Amino acid sequence: MSEKKINLLDLDRKALRVLFTEMGEKPFRADQLMKWIYHFGVSDFEEMTNINKVLRAKLAAKCEIVAPEISSYQKSVDGTIKFAINVGDGQEVETVYIPEDDRATLCVSSQVGCALECTFCSTAQQGFNRNLTVAEIVGQIWRVADFIGFVKDTGERPITNVVMMGMGEPLLNLKNVIPAMDIMLDDFGFSLSKRRVTLSTSGVVPALDKLGDALDVALAVSIHAPNDELRDVLVPVNKKYPLEEFLGGIRRYIAKSNANRGRVTVEYVMLDHINDSTDQAHELAKLMKDTPCKVNLIPFNPYPGSPYGRSSNSRIDRFSKVLMEYGLTVIVRKTRGDDIDAACGQLAGDIRDRTKRLAKKQMQESQISVTMN
């Protein structure tokens, strides 16, 4: 049996330099290779003309550049495109491209399914299957960039922002998320500004501390409730890491990071008559008083079988005004791609039926406890 080839999309620049050194080559070859892959979308070693033929042959014998394939896509009336990405074994994840006048954002998945069981999220209903590899994470960007169109010979890319807000909890896959985000930030990788790469988390506090030691990227935090009693229901990981512990981790991250410009984004999904009263707005404002933040109010995006409804515009408006009375910056998120189930909280769709659900004990122990070791 032939030796399995190394997928170069799994390696950040540090790991690539080690690989080239082990091959008896100069480490700077890693920089050249990354530029071909991430700036120009090249996967054929023969097209890498500033790398000599002997080395190209060595690379072809030992390595490969393989990104997961796009299985299908849907385009919204607002220009949003939802991609189903085949990650093997009959499993898919979803990736969403959101074009705007001055930027283009890609919402990237970090896991097949999710272990956290947030009750308002479609992805959570399919359960957790496995973590994505580095290649499967950066491969989402690589495939969509190729689909939209690399501008050959210039290195210009059609994606300006990446948000780790797709399927899965990124902090439960730190082993692969950190090198993947390194590639996003690397000048020889996707060359994105640290303020244009955002990780969203529901609050796995020990992993948040590890992230702060490893990377400086923008942080969005899924709060969704102004107290532990309600958050225990909406975001069950709160039972393990309650709000005060989560807020402590957020403040520690802010102290280490400058990508956030001194504050984080608080995500708060608006659920009709569940978490959207004016009393709850006052409670949320008081909760966040010692945590520098802006608040992103997200109108709930219903999905089949959802137990919740979307807050009315009037309730969202009243909630927003209360927060602003406390001096908080408040943004009401514009829903994008909801006609193709690509909006916040809707990712999973038809994939749910093709992804097996693991037992609750395995989800909790292997994902929340073991991953932190």
UniProtKB/Swiss-Prot annotation:
GO terms for cellular component: cytoplasm. GO terms for biological process: rRNA base methylation; tRNA methylation. It comes from Shewanella halifaxensis (strain HAW-EB4). S-adenosyl-L-methionine binds at G168, E169, S200, S222, I223, H224, N301. PROSITE patterns: RADICAL_SAM. Keywords: 4Fe-4S, Cytoplasm, Disulfide bond, Iron, Iron-sulfur, Metal-binding, Methyltransferase, rRNA processing, S-adenosyl-L-methionine, Transferase, tRNA processing. Gene3D superfamilies: 1.10.150.530, Aldolase class I. Its main location: cytoplasm. This is Dual-specificity RNA methyltransferase RlmN. The lineage of its organism: Bacteria, Pseudomonadati, Pseudomonadota, Gammaproteobacteria, Alteromonadales.
